[in-house]
C-alpha cells in the first residue's frame, strides 16, 4: 500500500555500532567479526554527528588559566538562523544572536557587500544569557550572488561600549567570528527567515 504523501518519507542511511576504539591486541576472530549495522534516518544521523562534535568542543567555552585567546567566546554565542535568503526584490530578514556564555560580549557586524545590505545594529554589547535581534536588509537588485555577514565577537571588559572595545583592541586581540550566508535568488517568493 503506497503512501499518499511523500513528505512523510525520510531518507535512511546505515550506521555501524562500535563500542569504542580497538586496541592492537585483538584476536583474529575479533578483527574479522562484522560490526552490527542499524538503519537510521539521515536527519537523526546529522543530529548525532552535530551532538558529537559539540560535546568534543564543549571545553572551548571555558577559558583555561593563562588563556588570552578569544576562541572560547564563539562557542558560547549562536546566531539563529545562520542563513538569510532574499529575492531580487530585496527585503528584511531578522535573526537572533544569543550569548550563552558567562561573559559580557561586544559584537561588531561586517558584511562582504555594504552597498547591497544594511545591518542593524553594527555595534552592540550583549550581557550573559541575553539575546540581540539582528536585522539584515537587502536593496532591490537584479544581481544574484552569495555574500557573507560576519559577526565579530570580543569579550567586553567593564562597562565600555562595543565600538570603544573594538577600537581599543584593533591591534592587540583578534576577534572570534561567526559567519552567516546571505543568499539572493531570482525566485519572487519571500525567502526570509529560512535556514
Curated annotation (Swiss-Prot):
- Specify the domain of life of the species encoding this protein: Eukaryota
> InterPro entries in the record, alphabetically?
Ig-like_fold, MSP_dom, PapD-like_sf, Sperm-specific_class_P
Record region (Disordered): 1-35
What the entry lists under Pfam families is as follows: Motile_Sperm (PF00635)
* TM region(s), chain numbering: none
Q: Where is the composition biased (Low complexity)?
A: 20-30
Family annotation (SUPFAM superfamilies): PapD-like
Query: Which residue range or ranges hold the MSP domain?
Result: 76-184
Q: Do you know which PROSITE patterns this protein is assigned to?
A: MSP
Protein name, entry field:
Uncharacterized protein D2007.2
Amino acid at each position: 500500500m503506497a503512501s499518499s504523501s511523500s513528505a512523510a518519507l525520510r531518507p535512511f542511511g546505515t550506521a555501524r555500532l562500535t563500542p569504542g576504539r580497538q586496541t592492537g591486541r585483538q584476536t583474529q576472530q575479533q578483527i574479522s567479526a562484522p560490526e552490527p549495522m542499524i538503519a537510521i534516518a539521515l536527519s537523526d544521523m546529522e543530529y548525532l554527528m552535530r551532538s558529537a562534535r559539540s560535546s568534543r568542543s564543549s571545553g572551548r567555552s571555558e577559558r583555561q588559566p593563562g588563556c588570552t585567546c578569544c576562541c572560547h567566546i564563539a562557542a558560547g554565542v549562536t546566531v539563529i538562523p545562520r542563513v538569510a535568503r532574499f529575492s531580487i526584490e530585496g527585503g528584511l530578514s531578522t535573526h537572533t544572536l544569543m550569548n550563552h556564555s558567562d561573559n559580557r560580549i561586544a559584537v561588531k557586524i561586517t558584511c562582504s557587500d555594504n552597498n547591497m545590505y544594511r545591518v542593524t545594529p553594527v555595534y552592540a554589547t550583549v550581557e550573559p544569557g541575553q539575546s540581540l535581534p539582528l536585522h539584515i536588509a537587502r536593496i532591490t537588485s537584479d544581481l544574484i550572488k552569495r555574500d557573507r555577514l560576519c559577526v565579530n565577537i570580543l569579550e567586553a571588559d567593564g562597562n565600555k561600549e562595543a565600538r570603544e572595545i573594538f577600537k581599543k583592541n584593533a591591534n592587540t586581540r583578534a576577534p572570534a567570528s561567526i559567519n552567516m550566508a546571505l543568499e539572493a535568488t531570482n525566485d519572487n517568493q519571500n525567502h526570509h527567515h529560512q535556514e
